[in-house]
């Protein structure tokens, strides 16, 4: 049960984090127990967690803010074991390093920083970036389908997740359809000139970019033209002297 002091402090922090949430972080207390907070971390860009959605829990002692909370993550993420207390400097593993001036925002910002790093601690796991990316991609679907605590605490995010997943699937399906077709490609003289008749060869050579580097086929065709022209010139020059 929350003390008056912890109740007052956590109520104040909820107002603060609602008005000014840290980047990639949101959090709210359980409607039935202010000592239990549910947070959501959105994977930052340019990390293996990009576009992932990670739900977890902070459990505060009644002595808060003089004692730290426990920290755990529920959504599979590839960085932390699920539903396992994490050993961080701002968690209940280290009450000796806890600072009462720290807040929920401070805790979650620190958790995000640790998550995107590679340090090891109790509760952390080691996986490849590919695994983290795969879990990030499936995280919204997992939260909606498998995470009852998430759906209870964040009904607005459940609805948004459905929209986001449907839009992503539509984009991927459209891209796959485009890739599976064989769109008409610009005619490549370098690959096809030898198969053309002389008239088409001449037309395509004229249409080529004057600044492009001639291909082997074009160079060979041009060389033949030069040789023929030289032969004709020599022929007429010979008869003009006779």
UniProtKB/Swiss-Prot annotation:
Top-rank EC class of the record's enzyme: transferase
Main location: endoplasmic reticulum
Pathway: Protein modification; protein ubiquitination
Pfam families: UQ_con
Upper lineage: Eukaryota, Fungi, Dikarya, Ascomycota, Saccharomycotina
Protein encoded by which gene: UBC6
Protein name: Ubiquitin-conjugating enzyme E2 6
Keyword Zinc-finger on entry: no
The family this protein is said to belong to: Belongs to the ubiquitin-conjugating enzyme family.
Positions of the UBC core domain: 5-156
Native source organism of the sequence: Debaryomyces hansenii (strain ATCC 36239 / CBS 767 / BCRC 21394 / JCM 1990 / NBRC 0083 / IGC 2968) (Yeast)
Biological process, per Gene Ontology: protein ubiquitination
CDD domains membership: UBCc_UBE2J (cd23799)
